Amino acid sequence: MSAALAVTDEVALPIRAVGDLAAAAEVSREEVAVITQCAALGGKLPFEDASVGAVLAVIKNVESLREQLVAEIRRVLKAGGRVLVQSPAPSSSQKPNTDIERKLLMGGFAEVQSSAASSQDSVQSVTVKAKKASWSMGSSFPLKKTTKALPKIQIDDDSDLIDEDSLLTEEDLKKPQLPVVGDCEVGAAKKACKNCTCGRAEAEEKVGKLELTAEQINNPQSACGSCGLGDAFRCGTCPYRGLPPFKPGEKVSLSGNFLAADI
């Protein structure tokens, strides 16, 4: 397997050019394979993929450096390999080195640069150098994700902390006093018990004193002056509630069916 490859579109390749390629590739001259009249190969190079470390293309006509030939040079080069393209120096109106740089860039090469014109065998020529990427198609590498560290919270131990026990006073800690529940009987008809302490016995005594007597019925007397106007004007403790309106001093008489059921 050759360490370097030299191609040209001419019939022969100068020995000096082969020596320059060997020096650039850091190999001996015997390790350099030479292909002449590369245009006759139809753009195909009889080498395996990534098999040579450097390629020297001596091109007399820039049109010979076609896209297919550039792709083949890139195919046979190893990852990180270099390619050198030599062509006759351009005249003032022609710039073939610019076309070569563009073709190499379009072919996937990197670090494309042209050197100053040099003279070989009384012929001015320029050299365009380029490099194949150091990675190959299908290669992969893990991505290192940078994780942002959480900001550290500075806690000041000297800061004043509130004691929750100090928020309650002695009054708050005392057991609340429940309201006194009436100790009398409960039910539909509540009555004061014998030892009443809730005040129900006193209330019943006051109500008992308000019961109507025969004298009050025969000679009604109003303390507020509204008893004879009817229930709409009588107070809540009026003894005449339920009786029809009457005039002061008028005898109150009830019909015979007053206490009879309506049904």
Curated annotation (Swiss-Prot):
[4Fe-4S] cluster binds at C224, C227, C235, C238. Residues 1-141 are annotated as: N-terminal SAM-like domain. This is Anamorsin homolog. It comes from Zea mays. Residues 184-198 are annotated as: Fe-S binding site A. Residues 142-173 are annotated as: Linker. It comes from the Eukaryota. [2Fe-2S] cluster binds at C184, C193, C196, C198. It is found in: Cytoplasm; Mitochondrion intermembrane space. GO terms for cellular component: cytoplasm; mitochondrial intermembrane space.
